[in-house]
Amino acid sequence: EPYRRQRQMCIRDSHWCIAAISTVAGAVNEYTSRMPSALALSAMVLVGYVFYAKRRGAEVAFIAALLTLTNFEVHRAGVACRVDMVLTAMMVIALYQLYKWGEKDLKGVPWVAVLCLSAAALTKGPVGIVLPCLVPAVFLWIRGRKFLRIFFSFLMVAVLACVLPAVWYWAAYQQGGDHFLDLVLEENVYRFLGKMTYASHENPAWYNVMTVVAGYAPYTLLGLVSLFFLRYRKPQGRVRTWWSRFVAYIRNMDDARLYSLLCIVIIFTFYCIPKSKRSVYLLPIYPFIAYFLAEYIIYLRHRHLNALRVFG
């Protein structure tokens, strides 16, 4: 009960979006309440299409956009009156923009990314800044950029992104006092450290795997169906040989593909650490999974068309 009252003080930016849309519509109703999520999903899909079309081709970009838009978990979040889709869109768009910034050798200030990070932080807290900065930083480090330059460049971005949230947090602290501060620490620090004073969505690590498999329905069925059409070869060589080939494959991977893979691996691993786990936490990896799934569908079309026919 006390935490329920404290949560009421955390008015998120998606709530302001609902208020703005409802003002234009003249009333608060189910339509205006769900509109921010729908608009956020639309923006995320369109930006993702442009991002991949430029780097990997229009065909794979279009298929990835359709897969993102129509899988169960993203579709559910896109029509719900919740903060999750707004957070996801802001994080994913920031990830795209920070990649483009890296292509420009980290020159200038990625203002679109900064604004998206600020909106993500206002939606769900510091994680909206930390994760989108961590992924491109790791990517650039793997590609041989100097660590100190990467660190200070993304530190600058993070500091700029904290300006707007800091103003809001200060105003909220003036109104809520220590109760608000306790809530912020509980939700953003103690949750990650597993030291929350109350149980909140506690699940084992395998729960995240299960939610992604279920959340990507119906396309997980395509993956299962295709297994019966693939050709398998007996593994040859030692484990060390396999590992060397894997490392070489990663090093030679196209930049956009490697970046998409890192988005999936880092974000997924991050959310496996805290005890608190929910399916919606993993929404930011869905557009990047869609990219690889789109490539797989194109592969099946050329090599194993019957798998697609059986799927439907």
Question: Where in the sequence are the language-model features?
Answer:
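Membrane-integral, polyisoprenol-dependent glycosyltransferases
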Residues: 4-8, 12-306
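Transmembrane helical bundles and short interhelical boundary loops of multi-pass, membrane-embedded
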Residues: 310-312
